[in-house]
A protein has these predicted regions:
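Alpha-helical support elements that line or immediately flank enzyme active sites
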Residues: 53-55, 113
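Glycine-centered low-complexity coil/loop motifs and glycine-rich tracts
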Residues: 1-49, 58-107, 116-149
């Protein structure tokens, strides 16, 4: 549940080059553009265990097992120009966004605790990559577990 986010999907195939105009000779259509590469997924937040008879968290204490953000997919390239009367090649599909890493797991096991207001415990999921329209999911929120021992 807390591993790295998956890689973004591969870019779509470039569009077919346009046909040459029959009245103007048989110019070749341009090549389709290359598909963009998928973004790398974010890393999971990992795990932290605090097991002690007494746990103290001060006002500036920070415990963080957040997932990292996924990388953005790379946009597809534009196809080449046609030769002669040929049309231009289509633009390649965009690569998928990398998924955000899932938040991790934090365990606080104690007999007594002293938590001062202002501390921070977070297990947020990472954001997906931000290439427009290229999919990718945000990471899931992790788990914070308190246990009396």
């Amino acid at each position: 549940n807390y591993g790295a986010g998956g890689n973004g999907g591969g870019g779509g195939q470039g569009g077919t080059g346009g046909r040459g105009c029959s009245q103007c000779g048989s110019g070749n259509g341009g090549n389709g553009g290359a598909g963009g590469s998928g973004g790398t997924g974010g890393y999971g937040g990992g795990s932290v265990f605090f097991i002690s008879p007494q746990i103290n968290l001060g006002a500036n204490s920070v415990i963080s097992c957040n997932g990292s953000n996924g990388a953005s997919g790379i946009a597809g390239t534009v196809g080449g120009n046609g030769q002669g009367a040929g049309g231009n090649g289509g633009t390649g599909g965009d690569g998928g966004n990398g998924a955000g890493g899932n938040g991790g797991f934090i365990l606080l096991a104690y007999t007594n605790k002293t938590f001062t207001s202002g501390y921070s415990i977070t297990v947020a999921g990472g954001a997906a990559g931000t290439l427009s329209g290229a999919g990718g999911n945000a990471g899931k929120t992790g788990v914070i577990k308190e246990l009396s021992i």
